[in-house]
């Protein structure tokens, strides 16, 4: 039997820099750590990826929490308003 993955909403995309493939994420709930798996969903967006790189004010960070606004390296194009979910095993 396939177990469905549990997802927790952690934030939303507020901006996207296409040239450098970075989405700006406002963390609205919970936390994210480098190595976590996330699912980004929106009207034209739906993909999963591992969190490989996060920055706050151009400084590399390992963990972020509610209230932080971060730059997140993304593997596909994202749009403002897309929701970011952390996949919980």
Regions from the PLM with identified roles:
Residues 2-32, 36-89:
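Beta-strand/loop-dominated core regions that host nucleotide or nucleotide-derived cofactor-binding catalytic loops
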């Amino acid at each position: 039997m396939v177990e469905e993955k549990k997802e927790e909403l952690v934030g939303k995309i507020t901006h996207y820099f296409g040239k450098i493939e970075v989405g700006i994420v406002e963390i609205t709930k919970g936390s994210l750590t480098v190595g976590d798996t996330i699912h980004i969903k929106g009207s034209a967006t739906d993909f999963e990826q591992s969190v490989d790189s996060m920055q706050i004010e151009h400084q590399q960070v390992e963990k972020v929490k509610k209230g932080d606004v971060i730059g997140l390296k993304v593997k596909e194009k994202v749009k403002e308003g897309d929701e970011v979910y952390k996949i919980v095993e």
